Amino acid sequence: MKLFKSILLIAACHAAQASAAIDINADPNLTGAAPLTGILNGQQSDTQNMSGFDNTPPPSPPVVMSRMFGAQLFNGTSADSGATVGFNPDYILNPGDSIQVRLWGAFTFDGALQVDPKGNIFLPNVGPVKVAGVSNSQLNALVTSKVKEVYQSNVNVYASLLQAQPVKVYVTGFVRNPGLYGGVTSDSLLNYLIKAGGVDPERGSYVDIVVKRGNRVRSNVNLYDFLLNGKLGLSQFADGDTIIVGPRQHTFSVQGDVFNSYDFEFRESSIPVTEALSWARPKPGATHITIMRKQGLQKRSEYYPISSAPGRMLQNGDTLIVSTDRYAGTIQVRVEGAHSGEHAMVLPYGSTMRAVLEKVRPNSMSQMNAVQLYRPSVAQRQKEMLNLSLQKLEEASLSAQSSTKEEASLRMQEAQLISRFVAKARTVVPKGEVILNESNIDSVLLEDGDVINIPEKTSLVMVHGEVLFPNAVSWQKGMTTEDYIEKCGGLTQKSGNARIIVIRQNGAAVNAEDVDSLKPGDEIMVLPKYESKNIEVTRGISTILYQLAVGAKVILSL
């Protein structure tokens, strides 16, 4: 009896363990697994686990486009086999084609007739009419003449090709998906190549494509004739025809100042440079070519003017670089703002600011002691440095370590906040302002595309950023930075120890503590303050806020 009770007790324990093991609603914090109820009920599982982290799989990497000229024919295209070929007057009718025939007048008939194996269609009261081998353009005249043999008058005829014969064509060789593909006799070679996935851009040839019927070669196709000249012969396919894409032939690469920067294929052992340039289409202003050629373990470069291209040849594996080798003779700058002179000036290369200031005609509102200079190259460099700072900030926020689960959750929320801030900051475009020194402003060298702005005289001081009411305040002698901030309602509660900078009218940025007196046209910027346990994050955000305020005159908040 005791033995029986022991067996029952052991069985009950195993049953309890099994029940606990299959409890799909068990606490995931204890089991380490997410609850499965939603999944078993056909619901989608949440992409975020209980800790709040996003488990969404990363997006697939972008598809790398091939550099081979011709690969664009098969990028994202799908074959559309149109059965009607009435638009092609040279189409030759074959058994299996469908022809629409309409007769009206003394005798009426309207129907679709199929060409039988003997090449005939049968017209009521007329009899068989042989149409196989007749071009589509002659079809209506042929049927009309046969009807007129029976009905001399009062019967009108209209005949047109309705549908071509369905066929199956083999596509093989160096294509992505070789096989047997269906279509109609009027489908072009491109249709069948697209159905087979296109020419393999790494191994296949765009200039060596053969169409065979049995053992007889019907045509040799070079797709470059279509891409460059719009020529693609129309051929009618029959059941069992084979399209063979050969292996890649010789190639050369074109880079530089050209419209078609691709790798090109050619059939012969060499190709004239002039023909290669006609394919690549150099941009206006291109002056020179560089031919880079590998010879064994050595690499040789040749540099010529484009005018000397005739007579020179490219070989397999060569690289042709087209460049513009010109020296700037003049530069163009724009003069904007408060002046009465010309707004565009063409100056000799190497001109200085003095050459512009001598031609500027200031008016009564011109603030000539605060001339501003904006340069595209400086704006590009500012953008590069801003992106670098943003990248470091993201790395610092994502690499922060946590010792507890609560701290990890806070770090995750902070990282999401910083990611949104970084996304906003990436959209900011720096102005590229160059701070001019009054002592040597005349000797500043100018670049092509520079913009010189003559600011207007003003009696206002602008206050931006973390103040209750950002506004413009009338300038008053003796007022300090704190006075202007108080005029705008004072600092916000979260900016008690905020960093304040003053931007002069000429673009110079000065710490507010170092400003003795404010001038008309100054801008006071109160930067937001951000605190984090991660010192690198705090330093990174503070640096970026300062860069945005000085480089783009923009204040972003988190």
Swiss-Prot record:
Keywords: Capsule biogenesis/degradation, Periplasm, Signal, Transport. Residues 1-20 form the signal peptide. The keyword Disulfide bond does not apply. GO terms for molecular function: polysaccharide transmembrane transporter activity. InterPro entries: Poly_export (IPR049712), Poly_export_N (IPR003715), Soluble_ligand-bd (IPR019554). The keyword Transmembrane helix does not apply. GO terms for cellular component: periplasmic space. Its main location: periplasm. Disulfide bonds: none annotated. It is found in: Periplasm. Involved in the translocation of the polysialic acid capsule across the outer membrane to the cell surface. May function as the periplasmic binding element of the PSA transport system, in which it transiently interacts with the membrane component of the transporter, binds polysaccharide and transports the polymer to a component in the outer membrane. To E.coli K5 KpsD. This is Polysialic acid transport protein KpsD.
